[in-house]
């Protein structure tokens, strides 16, 4: 059975609504790396990074492939680049005017 757009959007945006996951994506956009390298680069425990990459891999936001003993993580730019461009465009166009997108509540 095909999932509704509401369900799909909820799952994707829930997976992205986490500062650690966004930091992971930002780090990996230009430089694929292993979980260990990523944990070091972000100053996080490897277990925390592993916990946060699992849902990103399940939604195909990240991909993983093996190089020797390492699992190398890569950002799926086919989905992430246009999504981040749309978010950035929205923030530039509407947030300075409305001021609500960037305010913390």
Question: What label would you give each PLM region?
Answer:
Residues 4-47, 60, 67-80:
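N-terminal helix-turn-helix DNA-binding core of bacterial DNA-binding proteins
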Residues 52:
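Residues within the DNA-recognition helix of helix-turn-helix
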Residues 14-17, 55, 88, 94:
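Generic alpha-helical secondary structure signal
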């Amino acid at each position: 059975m095909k999932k509704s757009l509401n369900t799909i959007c909820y799952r994707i945006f829930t997976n992205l609504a986490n500062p650690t996951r966004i930091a992971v994506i930002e780090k990996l956009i230009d430089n694929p790396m292993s979980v260990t390298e990523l944990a070091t680069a972000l100053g996080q425990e490897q277990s925390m990074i592993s916990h946060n990459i699992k849902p990103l891999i399940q939604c195909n936001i990240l991909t993983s492939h093996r190089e020797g003993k390492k699992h190398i993580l890569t950002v799926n730019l086919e989905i992430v680049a246009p999504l981040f461009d749309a978010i950035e465009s929205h923030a530039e166009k509407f947030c300075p005017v409305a001021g609500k997108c960037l305010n913390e509540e």
